[in-house]
Amino acid sequence: MAVRSKSSKAWLHEHVNDHYVHMAQKDGYRARAAYKLLEINEKDKLIKPGTVLADLGSAPGSWSQVAAKLTGTSGAVFALDILPMEAIGGVSFIQGDFRENDVLAQFEGLLNNRPLDLVICDMAPNMSGNAVSDQARSFYLCELALDFASQHLKTGGSFLVKVFQGAGYQEYMAAMREFFGTVQTRKPEASRNRSSEIYLLGKNKR
């Protein structure tokens, strides 16, 4: 029988007693991360009826759930992930790597020449426990997301991405500023205090 480490026991205790976990269960969201997007959207009004957006690294789907509710039938939500994701009403899901040509072709076919207003990305790599390696892998995913956003967003569009503060953070912010008129930071209350995660919001794509 496996013995839990102190850190995993602490995480389990925190998870079981987490206010946002209980809210997610009550409200029908697949993960507590839904409230991060809801809080950011309350401030920045990124998603509204009619918004056309892509959710990168969407599984298990809580951000796509929020997006589908906020865009309504007049908008469109495209979710992409290499992992499987259970269907969500109002969400077009593509399973695959968004760097691959066949996946991009599927996405562009579904987009059908509509302007893309917003790209959201809450991706994180599977953590190995090696802080240096994990940080590098995290920013690699962020760079891929920025590349996708820079290629597909309409002029004036927005990009919301999760990053972890540390090595590479300032360089990534500088890269975002090349593509967006403004780059702002967001730390929603639903983000755990001990976490180094923060959200970068690029507005007014050039």
UniProtKB/Swiss-Prot annotation:
One of its GO terms (cellular component) is cytoplasm. Keywords: Cytoplasm, Methyltransferase, rRNA processing, S-adenosyl-L-methionine, Transferase. It is found in: Cytoplasm. Its main location: cytoplasm. The active site is at K162 (proton acceptor). The keyword rRNA processing applies. Its EC number is 2.1.1.166. S-adenosyl-L-methionine binds at G61, W63, D81, D97, D122. Gene3D superfamilies: Vaccinia Virus protein VP39 (3.40.50.150). It is an enzyme of class 2 (transferase). InterPro entries: RNA_methyltr_RlmE (IPR050082), RNA_MeTrfase_FtsJ_dom (IPR002877), rRNA-MeTfrase_E (IPR015507), SAM-dependent_MTases_sf (IPR029063). SUPFAM superfamilies: S-adenosyl-L-methionine-dependent methyltransferases (SSF53335). Specifically methylates the uridine in position 2552 of 23S rRNA at the 2'-O position of the ribose in the fully assembled 50S ribosomal subunit. This is Ribosomal RNA large subunit methyltransferase E. It comes from Neisseria meningitidis serogroup C / serotype 2a (strain ATCC 700532 / DSM 15464 / FAM18).
